[in-house]
UniProtKB/Swiss-Prot annotation:
The keyword Hydrolase does not apply. This protein binds specifically to 23S rRNA; its binding is stimulated by other ribosomal proteins, e.g. L4, L17, and L20. It is important during the early stages of 50S assembly. It makes multiple contacts with different domains of the 23S rRNA in the assembled 50S subunit and ribosome. It comes from Francisella tularensis subsp. holarctica (strain LVS). The keyword rRNA-binding applies. SUPFAM superfamilies: Ribosomal protein L22. Keywords: Ribonucleoprotein, Ribosomal protein, RNA-binding, rRNA-binding. This is Large ribosomal subunit protein uL22. Part of the 50S ribosomal subunit. Belongs to the universal ribosomal protein uL22 family. GO terms for biological process: translation.
């Protein structure tokens, strides 16, 4: 049985977040949390929070054993993009795209 947790509208691009997500896919939860703790990326902090939430959901709602959990599925989808204006020289302007993403983590017990 899979238990999931989601973080929606995270202020990080999906491309940057997927770099970290790909590292922990399929790992045992304890090893994944250890890897995320010592990563220097902003996405690692966000994903670690979602992973901890998924583990808490599994333990509280379904009574699963935390030590036997594995990151079965993790994916990052693009959220809406906020468009901002940046003034440039000679009356011009550039558009800045502030990207967001939706992070979904699913954990399951080892088979």
């Amino acid at each position: 049985m899979e238990v999931q947790a989601k973080l929606k509208f995270a202020r990080i691009s999906a491309q940057k977040c997927r770099l970290v997500a790909d590292q922990i896919r399929g790992l045992p939860v304890e090893q994944a949390i250890n890897l995320l703790t010592f990563s220097n990326k902003k996405a690692a902090v966000l994903i670690k929070g979602v992973l901890n939430s998924a583990v808490a959901n599994a333990e509280h709602n379904d009574g699963m054993d935390v030590d036997s959990l594995v990151v079965s599925t993790i994916f990052v989808d693009e959220g809406p993009t906020m468009k901002r204006f940046e003034a440039r020289a000679k009356g011009r302007g550039n558009r800045i795209l502030k990207r967001t993403s939706h992070i979904t983590v699913k954990v399951a017990e080892k088979k």
